[in-house]
Amino acid sequence: MKLTILGATGATGTCLTSQALAAGHEVTAVVRDPARLAVPDHPRLRTVTADVMDPASIAPAVEGADAVINAVGPRGTGPTTVVQDSARSIITAMDKTGARRFLQISGSIVADQGESPYMRYLVKPVARRTFLRHVCADMRRAEDEIRASDLDWTIFRPPALTGKAATGKAANGKAANGKAGACRTAVDRNLPHGFTVSRADLAACVLATLADPAAVRHHIAIAS
């Protein structure tokens, strides 16, 4: 498949780009600074320098893509609109170019369904009012805009991301099957006791979902 990955210089974007190339996909990595791309040159890798917040800037990178993956995320916990603004820009560019498949990395903090009572009624409400309030609000606004679009979207809601190595099992099953090897997945609900997942396993889950029609217009939770 022809994939366009935005946020390709981040930790999650690097995993996505590397794994996509290893799986045989053609990848267009959209970056602000090509020097920050931590993926070696590859015959199926095209690097495009563009501003993800400018639909006209990213439109050439999005045009002709079989799927567009947004791994842009906030760098800290302060006030931010980076997820919402990037999602809005991508939606506009996709509408203009006719691209249809959109995969967005969000977070489990935005939703409660499927959580244990302890997480649902104590931990998450506190986190949303304090240190994660800006990040959560930004992700929620982004999700609202994506759901309001007519794209074939899938939103991924991982918990805290780690730098651990891939289990090698997350891509063995489709995301909508309820389990992905050593990682658990769920559709339109969070996972109880799902506290962390590696970026490598998240990337494998995203790539396994690219052509899965059961995942279109659904939210996918993944956790270790």
What residue ranges belong to the model's regions?
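N-terminal Rossmann NAD(P)H-binding glycine-rich loop of SDR-like oxidoreductase domains
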Residues: L3-A23
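N-terminal Rossmann-fold cofactor-binding loop
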Residues: V30-A35, D51-V52
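Conserved Rossmann-fold cofactor-binding substructure of NAD(P)-dependent oxidoreductases
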Residues: R46-A65
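NAD(P)-cofactor binding segment of oxidoreductase domains
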Residues: R75-F102, R141
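Substrate-positioning beta->alpha
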Residues: V82, A87, D138, F156, ...
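Conserved beta-loop-beta element that borders a ligand/cofactor-binding pocket
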Residues: E143-K164
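Glycine/proline-rich active-site loop of Rossmann-fold NAD(P)-dependent oxidoreductases
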Residues: A165-G168, G178-C183, T209-H218
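Alpha-helical substrate-binding/gating segment
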Residues: S198-S224
